[in-house]
């Protein structure tokens, strides 16, 4: 037998038992006549004592070094009272080693487990990085999450059905990863950005509750919370309304938090997209932050200050305020830094006003813009924002999107900088009723979610006549400012689907080429259906308290979509390329 117990599982109940442990030397201490090691496996660490009573084991222990892979046979004994370590789960016991076997020695480590290592080092030697207890704990939590999800889905009548990895390229927002076909020369498969169309087809096939924990792929520019391959908890249902879908999924996430970290998330509030953008400047608001955005365009539309009056009189403009309670102590240097910060989001400046005495009107404020405001305007702004003595007001005035983005980002930064955001709290919500379409950089209409989302209370004719007025029957789940899941009611009427395609500039020929199979399937008694997908990586990130998605993926890529450990991607064998009828064209940059 190689193992009878895990190191991290030993406690007082095991005292007197003979155990066999297998794992790694985490730390070694030579005290002359005695040698102690901390022995580690995936479940934790236990102290092992080598005593002269068992001389052969003690002699062998002298050669042990960190990360040697070993086996210990010995007896669990109680630690003396003055040696109990309350910081360890196994701190009341130790193992008296009677036999020691070395499975494998370890070279000098390229990582130092007792210090911070660079991200590059950690990814290059990921198999060593994963030995660290905190990394092991994160992957164990991930396994616990998927286990809970599978049980929940099974208990609620969902079927785990796999969908293809090699599929057809369809426009879903990001670039596809393409896989060449050897048999069909010149043709390519695409790795799926999501199982979207296949899960809709499963609804058309009669499988009214589907789920899958599935890999997805997107060839896009990466951020700290993005990876080229990521994992979704993918869900689709038939004959359920949007509120019913949300109710089931909220129940799952509620149970997941209770099961994983023993936190009761309570009832999730529901907020429209419009309200979220107006009050918080984001469609994924972090409600742990008490700061809100207040519109004041109607108050300042006739002031003699074009920075305010211009956007205030522009139908596409916005003038709004963030009130920071007790923020008047913010220094001019900090204000300059905040002004520079909002510039990242396109804002041309940042007006501010300190409230030194809320009852003194203009005399009680300190601001470069005070000269443009009357007593009446000041009072109206104070009343609208509930300003108090000692507050500071920050103003955003620009095109609606620019002002909203800038103030939304500033709100988050102020919350962090001034310790207003309650970091020890959980704040979930649903955001619903998104616009059906948005303008892209060229000014063309694009689907805010994807082109298979159904509009709310619009006929195909109404949608074609007023596409920008349509509201999508879509919903996102947001927790602490992160979108952890999103979905929608799907289009199940072929006429509506063709209308959406036309609005997006996809003509009939392209519709047949790219989506002919879907349009055909919609003609054969398609049920009403709705679904959503959760990002498993992001859920795990939140539940383990890390801010980097790479910390919860066993073998992640860098922000350049590379694997430093295996050195992927790599050049292909010329013979393999020839069989695929592919030639590599070198550019001047190479």
Curated annotation (Swiss-Prot):
CDD domains: AspRS_core (cd00777), EcAspRS_like_N (cd04317)
MF (Gene Ontology): aspartate-tRNA ligase activity; ATP binding; nucleic acid binding
GO biological process terms on file: aspartyl-tRNA aminoacylation
SUPFAM superfamilies found in the cross-reference section: Class II aaRS and biotin synthetases, GAD domain-like, Nucleic acid-binding proteins
EC code: 6.1.1.12
Annotated stretches, region: Aspartate: 196-199
Location (main, coarse): cytoplasm
PROSITE patterns linked to this entry: AA_TRNA_LIGASE_II
Subcellular location: Cytoplasm
Keyword vocabulary terms for this entry: Aminoacyl-tRNA synthetase, ATP-binding, Cytoplasm, Ligase, Nucleotide-binding, Protein biosynthesis
Function text: Catalyzes the attachment of L-aspartate to tRNA(Asp) in a two-step reaction: L-aspartate is first activated by ATP to form Asp-AMP and then transferred to the acceptor end of tRNA(Asp).
Protein name: Aspartate--tRNA ligase
High-level lineage: Bacteria, Pseudomonadati, Pseudomonadota, Gammaproteobacteria, Pasteurellales
Gene: aspS
């Amino acid at each position: 037998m190689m193992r009878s117990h895990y190191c991290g599982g030993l406690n007082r109940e095991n005292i007197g038992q003979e155990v066999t442990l297998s794992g790694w030397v985490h730390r070694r201490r030579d005290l002359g006549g005695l040698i102690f090691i901390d022995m580690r496996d995936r479940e934790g660490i236990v102290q092992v004592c080598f005593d002269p009573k068992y001389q052969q084991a003690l002699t062998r222990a002298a050669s042990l070094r960190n990360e040697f892979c070993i086996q210990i046979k010995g007896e669990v004994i109680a630690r003396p009272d003055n040696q109990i370590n309350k910081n360890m789960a196994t701190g009341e016991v130790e193992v008296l080693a009677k036999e020691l076997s070395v499975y494998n020695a370890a070279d000098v480590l390229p990582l130092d487990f007792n210090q911070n290592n660079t991200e590059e080092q950690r990814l290059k030697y990921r198999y060593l990085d994963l030995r660290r207890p905190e990394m092991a704990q994160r992957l164990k939590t991930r396994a616990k999450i998927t286990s809970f999800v599978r049980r929940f889905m099974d208990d609620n009548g969902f079927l785990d059905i796999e969908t293809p990895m090699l599929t057809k390229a369809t426009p879903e927002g990001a670039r596809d990863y393409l896989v060449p076909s050897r048999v069909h020369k010149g043709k390519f498969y695409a790795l799926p950005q999501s199982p979207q169309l296949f899960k809709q087809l499963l609804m058309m096939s009669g499988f009214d509750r589907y789920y899958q924990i599935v890999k997805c792929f997107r060839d896009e520019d990466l951020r700290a919370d993005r990876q080229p391959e990521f994992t979704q908890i993918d869900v689709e249902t038939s004959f359920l309304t949007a509120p019913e879908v949300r109710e089931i999924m909220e129940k799952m996430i509620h149970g997941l938090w209770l099961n994983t970290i023993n936190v009761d998330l309570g009832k999730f509030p529901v907020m429209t997209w419009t309200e979220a953008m107006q009050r918080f400047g984001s469609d994924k608001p972090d409600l742990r932050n008490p700061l809100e955005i207040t519109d004041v365009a109607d108050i300042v539309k006739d002031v003699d200050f074009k920075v305010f009056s211009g956007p205030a009189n522009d139908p596409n403009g916005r003038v709004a305020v963030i009130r920071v309670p007790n923020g008047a102590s913010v220094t001019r240097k900090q204000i300059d830094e905040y002004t520079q910060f909002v510039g990242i989001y396109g804002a041309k400046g940042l007006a501010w006003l300190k409230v030194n005495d809320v009852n003194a009107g203009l005399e009680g404020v300190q601001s470069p813009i005070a000269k443009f405001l009357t007593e009446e305007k000041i009072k109206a702004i104070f009343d609208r924002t509930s300003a108090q003595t000692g507050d500071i007001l920050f103003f955003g005035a620009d095109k609606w999107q620019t002002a909203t983005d800038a103030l939304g980002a500033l709100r988050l930064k102020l919350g962090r900088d001034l310790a207003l955001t309650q970091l020890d709290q959980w704040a979930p919500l649903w955001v619903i009723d998104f616009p059906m379409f948005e303008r892209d950089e060229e000014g063309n209409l694009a689907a805010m979610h994807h082109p298979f989302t159904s509009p709310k209370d619009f006929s195909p004719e109404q949608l074609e006549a007023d596409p920008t007025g349509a509201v999508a029957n879509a919903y996102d789940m947001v927790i602490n400012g992160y979108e952890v899941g999103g979905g929608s009611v799907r289009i199940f009427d072929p006429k509506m689907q063709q209308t959406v395609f036309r609005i997006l500039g996809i003509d009939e020929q392209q519709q047949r080429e790219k989506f002919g199979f879907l349009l055909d399937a919609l003609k054969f008694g398609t049920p009403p259906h709705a679904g959503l997908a959760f990002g498993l990586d992001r859920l795990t990130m939140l539940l383990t308290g890390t801010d980097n998605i790479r910390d919860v993926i066993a073998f992640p890529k860098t922000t350049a979509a590379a694997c430093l450990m295996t050195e992927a991607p790599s050049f292909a064998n010329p013979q393999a390329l020839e069989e695929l009828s592919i030639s590599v064209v070198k550019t001047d940059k190479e």
